[in-house]
Amino acid sequence: MYGCKYPSFTQLINTFIAYLGLLTFSNSTWANTAGVFPPVVQEGHRSLQYRVTLNPDTGAFGTRLHYQESLNDDVMLRGIVHASESATGHSKVDFVQAELFWDLDEDTDRLRHGFRFDARARGRGEPSSVSVNYALQYSVSPQWQARLAVLNTRSFGDKANTDIQFQARSQLSYRASQAVSLNLEYYSQLGAIDNFNPWKNQKHQIGPSVNWRVANGWTLYGGFLSSMNNSSPDTVYRMWVTKAF
């Protein structure tokens, strides 16, 4: 309609492979690669996703690769690998993580909710963790959608802080067209669930993002987050590439 030319399938493949290569060249001080996960599970869903984030102040990259597949219309499994390279050039895998999504509602419900259970394993004596997380999603209209996620994480191991750590994330999304959605996202890390940190020690980030459903199962995501206090990077740029099968 506006003379825009979609990238070819070959161009998307090459772009995806190029981003994939960053997985082994990421700075260890990685930025926020998290998302506001939905409670929705779609039967027959399978996808591969690569995420890259950049803190322009330090040049630090965060990278993550995951594969997910639904078992039915209620349960989905996801596997994640996160790798990095230190300032001295030492490459390592930071962690691997397994996730189970449990959708508690029907596809026709406007109000959806569900759980996500996480198990994260780290090497080199670093603490591993488990999480029990809850997500809520409400479709206000065919165009507008609101989402909230709360995460409760407990670490274990010799160096672990055994307090249950609390996070909250939210997203307001507007579907501008069949291909494009515009979002406003918020992320916070508040501290121990029974004793929140003071504001100056909490982490709060907010910013816009856009989802572009391109073609042939490809989706591109781009956006940035800005800090609401001095405990997070001033700005973090984020890009995700997803291929559904």
Feature names for model-found ranges:
Residues A18-Y19, T29-A31:
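Cleavable N-terminal signal peptides
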Residues Q11-L22:
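Sec-dependent signal peptide recognition
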Residues M1-Q11:
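N-terminal secretory signal peptides that target proteins for export/translocation
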Residues F25-S26:
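N-terminal signal peptide c-region/cleavage motif recognized by signal peptidases
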Residues W30-F245:
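Transmembrane beta-barrel domains of Gram-negative outer membranes and organellar outer membranes
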Residues Y6, T15, F117:
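Alpha-helical and His/Cys-centered functional microenvironments
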